[in-house]
Amino acid sequence: MKKVFSTRLLFIIAVALLVSQKMRAQAFDGADDHRVYVGYSHIGKLSGVELGYEEGFNDYLSWGIQANVLFTGDKPDEEGKFLDAYDASFHCNFHWSEVFRLPSRFDVYTGVLAGLKTIGIGCGARYHFSENFGIYAAAHYSPISTFTLSGSRVYYKGEPALSVGLTIGW
């Protein structure tokens, strides 16, 4: 019984190693790239969650959308002030992997973003463990407010935003 288990385990490990040698993990595939990412976000002194989608346009450019929610500790009120902690944005990134001939598992990018609350710039990096799964870290700075009502609390403008999370591609 123990010998059969050991043989099966060795077979599974051998197959996994062979398959992993055939697969090439790439952090950015260009026009064929589609990614969903989810992560922890820290903006100013507040924490939150971000969820986004990114699609490659060519070997150097990608576009995407992103939604952020900050945990302010405020309760929903009648005036709708809790909506001040939400943001949605569009971003366009330039990927430096081809330019600097980085390993295919690693991607460094810079870009611009325009959202419901702010306009800004950002940069980030991704590392992929496999063809579909990886991690990312990003930083953004948004010096310009867009649609803010008078009396609204401004959480996003002028605050550094840092985020880390998981990315899933197909």
Placement of each model-derived feature along the sequence:
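Repeated loop/turn-to-beta-strand initiation elements of outer-membrane beta-barrel proteins
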Residues: 59-65, 99-103, 129-135
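Short glycine/proline- and aromatic-enriched beta-strand/turn motifs that initiate or cap beta-hairpins
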Residues: 21-63, 90, 94, 167-170
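Transmembrane beta-strands of outer-membrane beta-barrel proteins
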Residues: 34-38, 63-65, 106-112, 135-137, ...
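Bacterial Sec-dependent N-terminal signal peptides
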Residues: 1-30
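Residues on the lipid-exposed face of transmembrane beta-strands in outer-membrane beta-barrel proteins
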Residues: 40, 51-55, 88-98, 112, ...
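Predominantly the C-terminal beta-signal and adjacent terminal strand-loop region
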Residues: 70-78, 127-170
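Solvent-exposed loop/turn segments connecting transmembrane beta-strands
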Residues: 38-50, 75-84, 111-122, 151-159
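Flexible, solvent-exposed loop segments that connect beta-strands
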Residues: 27-34, 65-86, 106, 145-156
